[in-house]
């Protein structure tokens, strides 16, 4: 599947000018998952991160890794803008319906991810992801490497997931508005997949999906395939 590849390229290019720290995936060095939602009160909070979080799926090769662009959790002294982007290699299903269902299932992984002292709040409608990190977690050595290890482990519980690169961004110089736009576009592409499965319009000029098909490589081919147009 190539429909998200242009977004992966844009994110990578946006991060290119900034210094990065890259870690290999070490499952045994994962932060503890407490298995349930936590409430971290303001008085218990050391750092608040506010920004976006989204996943970009591809059939291209992705090596398991964690990349930190900017300061890590142990280095942050004040609240920060934030982004969490995952590049995910997966084996797409044999038809569009099953592939869409698989994408949604992979997306739902974030609702089963509960790092100790790391409270995640998401808004799918607003494409937002914010985090509260507790004083205790910081004291106990939490960092993005350990959080990323846990997240990759969660994704790879799904046998269709073959590789995951997690990118955490706190660098203040990054254009977070562009990341927000890419997150929004990612959501639009995913929702368009759902529409494609139910849209049997054969005329590109009158189809309400034309704008997305024109912009996203591979989307028109999926639409025609779904419509059984040769």
Regions inferred by a protein language model and the residue ranges of each:
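Signals and flexible motifs at protein termini associated with secretion
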Residues: 1, 6-19, 24-26, 119-146
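Charged, amphipathic alpha-helical stretches
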Residues: 1-64
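A broadly conserved sequence feature marking short terminus-proximal activation segments
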Residues: 132-195, 205
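Cysteine-cluster motifs in flexible loop/terminal segments that predominantly coordinate metals
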Residues: 182-225
């Amino acid at each position: 599947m190539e429909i998200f590849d242009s977004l992966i390229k844009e994110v990578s290019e946006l991060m290119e000018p900034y210094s990065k720290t890259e870690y290999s995936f070490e499952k045994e060095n994962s932060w503890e998952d407490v298995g349930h939602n936590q409430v971290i009160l303001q008085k218990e909070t050391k750092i608040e991160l506010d920004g976006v979080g989204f996943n970009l799926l591809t059939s291209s090769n992705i090596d398991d890794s964690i990349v930190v662009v900017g300061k890590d959790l142990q280095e942050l002294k004040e609240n920060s803008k934030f982004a969490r982007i995952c590049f995910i290699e997966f084996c797409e299903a044999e038809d569009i319906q099953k592939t869409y269902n698989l994408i949604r299932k992979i997306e739902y992984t974030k609702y089963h991810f509960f790092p100790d002292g790391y409270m995640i709040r998401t808004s799918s409608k607003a494409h937002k992801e914010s985090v509260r990190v507790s004083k205790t977690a910081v004291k106990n050595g939490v960092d993005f490497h350990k959080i990323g290890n846990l997240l990759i482990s969660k994704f790879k519980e799904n046998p269709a997931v073959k590789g995951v690169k997690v990118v955490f961004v706190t660098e203040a110089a990054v254009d977070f508005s562009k990341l927000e736009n890419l997150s929004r576009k990612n959501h639009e592409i995913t929702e368009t997949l759902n529409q494609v499965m139910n849209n049997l319009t054969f005329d590109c000029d009158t189809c309400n999906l034309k704008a997305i098909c024109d912009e996203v490589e591979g989307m028109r081919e999926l639409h025609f395939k779904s419509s059984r147009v040769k």
